[in-house]
Each structure stands twice: as C-alpha cells, then as structure tokens.
Amino acid sequence: MPRSIKKGPFIDEHLDRKVQSAQASNSRRPIKTWSRRSTITPDFIGLTISVHNGRQHIPVVVNENMVGHKLGEFALTRTFKGHVADKKAKR
C-alpha cells in the first residue's frame, strides 16, 4: 500500500538539507547518505547521490524517471553469483 498523498513524500531532514545546499552552490560532488528510505523528489534531478548498500556507497545519478521511487531501489544489497553447475552433468 503506497503512502497517503495527504502526508506527502518522506525525505530525511539531513538529506534534504544536503540537497538544498548542493543546489545552492551548484556542487557536482556526490552526496553521501545512508537513508535508503527517502523518496526521490524533483529537487534531486541531476544530482549524484551515494547510497549505502550495507557494505559500500553506490553512486546513483538521479534522472526524471526515478522521481517517486525510493533511493534504496537503485543500490542493490544482494549480489547473485549464478547457480552452481551440476557436477554429474559434466561427466
């Protein structure tokens, strides 16, 4: 169930402050955050945000197609190495 329109999108305050200061100074440096739960708003477009995936920060370049999604959707937490081949089939 999506969040109520009445409440508006959730953005951590510290991330919102960093985005506002990056826009004011026209900074191109990535914004480092651990807030995977924050919703991407139109203010984020064009910025690079480094989202923590539990081990490292993954750089995410925000475009207009990402608006409305969460930051955590673009920094995957699990790596799939593939299924191990059956040893009996090799013989």
UniProtKB/Swiss-Prot annotation:
The keyword Calcium is assigned to this record: no
Q: Does the keyword rRNA-binding apply?
A: yes
Query: Which GO-annotated molecular functions does the record name?
Result: rRNA binding; structural constituent of ribosome
Signal peptide range equals: none
Q: Which GO BP terms apply?
A: ribosomal small subunit assembly; translation
The chain's coiled-coil residues are none
Q: Tell me the segments the record calls region Disordered.
A: 1-32
Gene3D superfamilies, per database record: 30s Ribosomal Protein S19, Chain A
Q: Bias regions of kind Basic and acidic residues — which residues?
A: 9-19
Family per similarity comment: Belongs to the universal ribosomal protein uS19 family.
Q: What is this protein called?
A: Small ribosomal subunit protein uS19
Question: What species was this sequence derived from?
Answer: Acidithiobacillus ferrooxidans (strain ATCC 23270 / DSM 14882 / CIP 104768 / NCIMB 8455)
List the gene name. Answer: rpsS
